[in-house]
Amino acid sequence: MAGEGDQQDAAHNMGNHLPLLPADSEDEDDEIEMEVEDQDSKEARKPNIINFDTSLPTSHTYLGADMEEFHGRTLHDDDSCQVIPVLPEVLMILIPGQTLPLQLSHPQEVSMVRNLIQKDRTFAVLAYSNVQEREAQFGTTAEIYAYREEQEFGIEVVKVKAIGRQRFKVLELRTQSDGIQQAKVQILPECVLPSTMSAVQLESLNKCQVFPSKPISWEDQYSCKWWQKYQKRKFHCANLTSWPRWLYSLYDAETLMDRIKKQLREWDENLKDDSLPENPIDFSYRVAACLPIDDVLRIQLLKIGSAIQRLRCELDIMNKCTSLCCKQCQETEITTKNEIFSLSLCGPMAAYVNPHGYVHETLTVYKASNLNLIGRPSTVHSWFPGYAWTIAQCKICASHIGWKFTATKKDMSPQKFWGLTRSALLPTIPETEDEISPDKVILCL
């Protein structure tokens, strides 16, 4: 484990630095060498075929294959008050449905997890907008579904896979005599809004409505005609109101989901509808978990209690926030929305944990700029098996941005990509759009 002086390096490393390939330079005595990223990144192109097994990142094989798995789930009643223990070292905003991998070595945390396994396996993850914030107002319950204990250098370590379940509002926080923090929370309900046309159409005639059969593929002209015909029939009752059909479609869950799916297909050309949740609530959380937004925006999404409003906000963010800059510099562009792609079944971004217990939500992109590479490539504890990682820092302020991943075999595709940590990125609205300053643009929140 890293010493006190190496805490920052421990947060950025996936494992110890081990050379994957012999260094080109003869100066092999330097433990760490700085390399400025060359034109290789700028010339990177999107590969036509991805032969990487996208199920590997979601399985978190780096935690070990022999984890004890649990079945069933714990759900609390809406608006009920619960007292749930808090894991203090989990500094991320967990979204319901999002997977949270953990590696815990502190005796207090190990003891707490053991007790949770004997009960309902549920703990609280508090949502802080920044590390200086002392009290959180919202959070998400997390349920452990896989667990493993082992010893590393005589230290007991617990490896956990958990999943976000329900949003809550924090009512009270108190610390027990054993140091474990307990949170009294109120479970927040999901507001399910009726159909936009429900007020003007007779429910008795719903069974008489006939809709065209859904196309198998969305890539041909027939699909576009099908959707236009479907929209006309779905909103035909708008003719009886004072408002146009397009206005109702802005608050229709199915229409919003379809527009977001078109954006997601730009990140993953092989995306299939059956791999996405059909329920608007689950779908909205799935999208929220893979959006590269900062903590302030993410908490705003977590506060929203309606799937339709959440979908509207997500679509607005995807359309406007097209540039990702260094959070420390705020003006140094690292990548753009067009470079995002998916190398995992859960989308372009997911949470991973390094051997030191630091959780990073990592976004995969083809191309990144204004970055320096630190050290040599290493395959130790790689979140993407078959790829070696190298620490990447901002070229201007030297803050940690993520990692560059390079394939260890020539037949792998893509040969290289970047994994950028969400906490280091700042979503930005380019000034060229609509000639409006980003500070004056208001998102649909």
Swiss-Prot record:
Residue span(s) of domain CULT? 321-429
The tissues where this chain's protein is expressed are given as: Highly expressed in brain.
SUPFAM superfamilies linked to this entry: PUA domain-like
Fetch the Gene3D superfamilies from UniProt: 1.20.58.1480, LON domain-like, Peptide methionine sulfoxide reductase
Q: Which GO cellular component terms, listed alphabetically, does the Swiss-Prot or TrEMBL entry include?
A: Cul4A-RING E3 ubiquitin ligase complex; cytoplasm; membrane; nucleus; perinuclear region of cytoplasm
Q: Which residues carry this modification: Phosphoserine?
A: 25
Q: Where are the transmembrane segments?
A: none
Q: What is known of its domains?
A: The CULT domain binds thalidomide and related drugs. Thalidomide binding leads to a change in substrate specificity of the human DCX (DDB1-CUL4-X-box) E3 protein ligase complex, while no such change is observed in rodents.
- Similarity section: Belongs to the CRBN family.
- Its recorded name reads Protein cereblon
